[in-house]
Amino acid sequence: MKVFVLGWLLKINLMKTLYSQRRFYHVETPFNTNVGVGGRDIESTGFAWWSGNARLINVSGKLLGAHVAHAGIMVFWTGAMTLFEVAHFVPEKPLYEQGLILIPHLATLGWGVGPGGEIFNTYPYFVVGVVHLISSAVLGFGGLYHSLIGPDTLEESFPFFGYDWRDKNKMTTILGIHLVLLGIGAFLLVIKSLFVGGVYDTWAPGGGDVRFVSNPTLNPLVIFGYVLKSPFGGDGWIVSVNNMEDLIGGHVWIGIICIAGGIWHILTKPFAWARRAFVWSGEAYLSYSLGALSIMGLTASNFVWYNNTAYPSEFYGPTGPEASQAQAFTFLVRDQRLGANVASSQGPTGLGKYLMRSPSGEIIFGGETMRFWDLRAPWVEPLRGPNGLDLNKIKNDIQPWQERRAAEYMTHAPLGSLNSVGGVATEINSVNYVSPRSWLTTSHFFLGFFLFIGHLWHAGRARAAAAGFEKGINRENEPVLSMRPLD
């Protein structure tokens, strides 16, 4: 017996959504025999329960509830995980050896940390965790209220918060509000660094300290020079930022641009070319958002792997090149104490064993680490002169804190696999651990990549719907539909 004999074809024809008709075969299951949630079931929306928020495309109040509840889940994780890290924190060990990823971010903001990146007070982290937990409860209540009790749609009762996905002016107004909020977020970091206790600067003399960034770089040639730089080699695009003045100055510019752009989008209507160029539907906006998040994730992945200014090595562990250079430096210090002439000793290839010259003539560390000759790190920069490493400083001016830090970084390279088999292959003293730098890099690459796939998927569906053709497989003439049911 064909399925449409049962009358389901009529329901299919009556199912209209913003995008296109969906065909389905009705299945009664024990848990939903008597349950029908208007506006959120397959008959009225064309989407099954596993399509998630797609069921809420045309019920703005319920979609608000889903988003607020989702925010509550995220904030709850943040608070709970912060308290978990505080409970497991061991002051005698570096943060990066304890698998912590939230306390390092809070320490970078200058809370609870002193000279050399030493954590002396975990109470601020406890406060942050509790504040997030309380906030998550408020968000959770709001999510439940709007999902279960509040109005299905906001347009009638709260026109300011209501919307139609096809209303181009309203959509750009919402975009503008989001940009203003992002700009305010950027300025919060600026305010923290300028006026509220300062931030941790790994480049502060003597091995890093909390300080006020009182003179941020505002020169647009410097700030936008990062954006226009090549992403390859030693140029490093925006990832190459190596001082707090430029980093905070960049946030000043981003804050100004986001707020100005937000006000622009709130006050104006999209131009004719923009109305023609973009697809104006809920799924299209989802695809745009996923594309933007993908760029952010992939950028963050590169940033945390290579950059030791925004992500200080005291908290996140050394970068790969930093651990390699630290190994060469550690053995230079050891053998120099034993009487080796580090300036003239040759390695097995005839190149300098401890020191050598780069192709451009600068003095660099010799051996395998020569490929990382352009590394910049706070513990090695004081030993440089006008032409690379200064031989006089190498012989007479190496400080104990530099030796200690290099030895620590040498044995904590961010090369561990997920089962904690880690370290530099040539360093028998390496510690088996997964570096937070490795973890954050790989997780953000993974998330960025799959967000990009999601962007392509939803962009393709949105464009197909806008072009007016059916998506998916036409199942009308599928043989199985004419076969006898299994039961």
Swiss-Prot record:
Which residues are part of the propeptide segment? 1-28
Instruction: Supply the InterPro entries for this chain.
Output: PS_antenna-like, PS_II_antenna-like_sf, PSII_PsbC, PSII_PsbC_sf
Binding residues annotated for [CaMn4O5] cluster, in chain numbering:
E381
Arranged from A to Z, the UniProt key words for this protein are: Chlorophyll, Chloroplast, Chromophore, Manganese, Membrane, Metal-binding, Photosynthesis, Photosystem II, Plastid, Thylakoid, Transmembrane, Transmembrane helix
Cofactor: binding comment: Binds multiple chlorophylls and provides some of the ligands for the Ca-4Mn-5O cluster of the oxygen-evolving complex. It may also provide a ligand for a Cl- that is required for oxygen evolution. PSII binds additional chlorophylls, carotenoids and specific lipids.
Q: Mind telling me which SUPFAM superfamilies this protein's record contains? A: Photosystem II antenna protein-like
Provide a GO biological process annotation: photosynthetic electron transport in photosystem II
Indicate how the chain sits in the lipid bilayer. Multi-pass membrane protein
Describe the subunit structure. PSII is composed of 1 copy each of membrane proteins PsbA, PsbB, PsbC, PsbD, PsbE, PsbF, PsbH, PsbI, PsbJ, PsbK, PsbL, PsbM, PsbT, PsbX, PsbY, PsbZ, Psb30/Ycf12, at least 3 peripheral proteins of the oxygen-evolving complex and a large number of cofactors. It forms dimeric complexes.
Protein name (record): Photosystem II CP43 reaction center protein
Organism of provenance: Porphyra purpurea (Red seaweed)
